[in-house]
Amino acid sequence: MLALVLAPSPLRAASAAPDANAAVTVTENASSFTLDNGIVKATIRKGSGSMASLVYRGVETMGGNGGYWEQTPQDAPQLTNTITIDPATNAGARAEVSIKGVTGGATMLGRGAPGGGTYCDMEIRYAIGRGDSGIYVYAIFNHPPNYRPGGVGSESRYITRLSPTFDWITVDKDRNMLEAAPTDWGTGVVVHAKEQRIMSKGVYKNSVEHKYSYSGVQYKTPAYGWSSTKDHIGIWFINPTIEYLSGGPTKLELDDHFGDNDNPEPIILDYWVGGHYDTGARVNLAAGEQWTRVVGPIFVYVNSLDHPKPATQAELSALAATAGNPIVPLSWHANANALWNDALAQAKKETAKWPYAWVKGVDYTPLDQRGTVTGRIVLNDPLAPKGTSSKFQQLTVGLTVPDSGNLPWIHNAKGYQFWADGTEDGSFSLSKVRPGNYTLRAFATGVLGDFAQADVTVEPGKTVNLGKLEWKPVRDGRQLWEIGYPDRTGDKFFKGDGANNWLWGWNLRYALLFPNDITYTIGKSDYRKDWFFEEVPHATDLSFVNPEARDPANQRFGWVKAESLEQYPQTNQTGPWAIYGKGRTTVWTVKFNLPKQEHGQAYLRVALAGVNGLRDGLGVGLNGQGIGAIGDGTDPDNARLITTNSIRYNADKGLNQQRTLKFDAALLKPGENQMTFTVPGGDLQSGVVWDYLRLELDENATPNPPPPTHKGQ
């Protein structure tokens, strides 16, 4: 396979440029529809609604099962396959086909639908227009009031399994790279679970390939996919809006990866229901409830380079000689960037066209029936330290469904969501909003907590001006110190940045970077280099380190010692992790000075970007005495922590959790104080991803009684 990867590019890419003005056609036989506009030719299976083939400039882009939804209507008692837009009626301008299943209230078991079935009817549509370099796909879920209560399963997504010609993966600027060869993955050793493997050969030898390294924030990832260093084509998913997704503007989900079997295919995914980082949402439908949801249209975009830059023989030879830290030809980077930048430009065009005028016959609100919400959010933070700016950094404002009982909005996928970036003075405008009743919400970098205002009603074709809205952030006393700043990620801390956080194994390498754990001095230390983004157990077995690695603590690839397949059976429960995946208790210390004896109530505010394990919370001590634990459940402001799998899945974020630990300020003393944070020994996947820490003091408040002794302290 390596020889194929390194073969000199023929520079033919795909066939000659197609006719962008060709008429669209649609044909059908007993088993499929074929849509063709002279640029792309798609074959859609009847029954399942899957895309069996997508040919672009003579190259088949699909592999394996092609493109498909997690659920499928194919087993519905009533199934119809219809041409919903016939190009014969519009002079070849557009074609659309529909595969619809009516279940009559029975469960709709989809292709591997997790957790059972979906108690809805489902329709899948594909559309192609004249000049479109790609195909639109969308799904319509419908729950009539006479259907039984239920949901849409724990996951719902559109997936494409691609041709092996695609060997370059792109999520964002930091994950824009040559992938491992499929055969190298197939012979790799399972580390802990089937989606984590150590490469024992190839250009990424002595590195771990992990499918969760390629998750992205949906709001910030407008175009992502794969490209080919051989055929010089790309294939991309474009969400023109995230209104039909769920989880808000910080939602992290899988975008691209290899399949996790021994013969993997490149994969692109678009989740509207999913929760790998506990940021996902679900659909809970009651008996008698009428509910409809249109997911998409998503644009599956394909593009090519007519004049790709060739790799030199010297570059190809250098890559062939690489084992662990590949020296990839600069021309391959340039070609991949050109394709990706074109896809990003196309994403802007798709957003400008949203909502699409050609979508008819479903619950899809046209532009003239949508509304706009405007206003200005103003910070009122009188207890903030002097010099704190009232201007916003990275303000994001949105409209969501109201919270419903025990189901907060961030976990509710029944409704639509609308988000936009605000300005530094707090002004915002949310356009193209479907009519309905919403809650206005806002997040901002540097501001702890979030803003919410209920009962915002949007009417068809109208603008709602909410005027000036006051946001009073969470704060109960004067600030004694802080570490970092709140932005719902760990990216500001050491190795938490986008160039590093997605790489597998920082929970192992913490022991190499900080052999004596962390001591942080307020006023002297720098959170950007002295505070690691994860606090995890301290690895005690360093046998995972490749003895030939130049800088195993810092280098991107090639720092793990490759193992033999014979040593570790290929199962989800065994592997090298059983040997080096555990560590001792980790204690981090924060030192700070106070000028005098304090009294009143102290508030330790902690925002966590991710949590794994820690059933009893994150133990906190002060001057040698335990004062409780973050997330111990003893106070409504200190609820128990929720596992997000962020450490296991190589992420700097997940469900953001903000907790407050209150204690008697008399425990503070004049001069030097030491506060400790303890993660118990155990699995290296347990611990926290830090977002922000702040200590406040209210001299006039009555202090809480001392907490019970916590075993993590």
Segments predicted by a language model, with ranges:
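Beta-strand-rich N-terminal accessory domains
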Residues: 14-68
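Extended, loop-rich substrate-binding clefts of extracytoplasmic carbohydrate-active enzymes
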Residues: 71-146
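A contiguous, surface-exposed recognition patch within enzymatic or periplasmic domains that forms
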Residues: 161-293
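A short, amphipathic beta-strand motif
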Residues: 371-382, 426, 469
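Short, acidic Ser/Thr/Gly-rich low-complexity loop/linker segments typical of extracellular
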Residues: 404-427
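Beta-strand-rich ligand-recognition modules
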Residues: 422-425, 572-599, 607-707
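A short, solvent-exposed beta-strand micro-motif common in secreted/extracellular proteins
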Residues: 426, 436-446
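Structured interaction patches on ligand/partner-binding surfaces of diverse proteins
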Residues: 445-474
